Amino acid sequence: MTGGKSGGKASGSKSSQSRSSKAGLAFPVGRVHRLLRKGNYAQRVGAGAPVYLAAVLEYLAAEILELAGNAARDNKKTRIIPRHLQLAIRNDEELNKLLGHVTIAQGGVMPYIHQNLLPKKTPKTGKNPSQEL
């Protein structure tokens, strides 16, 4: 054998592949499986459950980061800060419903001015009615 330990697998066998790479995910399937087992959510955890949960978590993270990146770009910034996360989540109807009771540290508040506090719009007719003869 070349450069390996003696014994073990044959030199022609392929290397091990993680469950995350098999599923095409960036989130760790093995870690999610371990956390599901240690969390006492159920006595047994199926093989597909951590893959599905990791895929859902990866999708949610990608969705939030995309919207936060757009908010950062709108503010002419290159780095996402908690304020951008807050703006992204609160401006999206579904994410706001999902994370409605979540407080984001250093997120600030949503800008809102009540209609009664805005200046009144005056109709522009071109001529003042009192000056007409």
UniProtKB/Swiss-Prot annotation:
Q: Which GO terms describe its cellular component?
A: nucleosome; nucleus
List the Gene Ontology MF annotations in alphabetical order. Answer: DNA binding; protein heterodimerization activity; structural constituent of chromatin
Localization per record: Nucleus; Chromosome
* Site feature (Not ubiquitinated) residues: 120
Which ranges are annotated Gly residues under compositional bias? 1-10
Instruction: Give positions of region: Disordered.
Output: 1-25
Q: From which domain of life does this come?
A: Eukaryota
Among SUPFAM superfamilies, the record links this protein to: Histone-fold
Give the note.
In contrast to vertebrates and insects, its C-terminus is not monoubiquitinated.
Q: What is this protein called?
A: Histone H2A
Q: Tell me what organism the protein belongs to.
A: Coccidioides immitis (strain RS)
This protein's gene is called HTA1
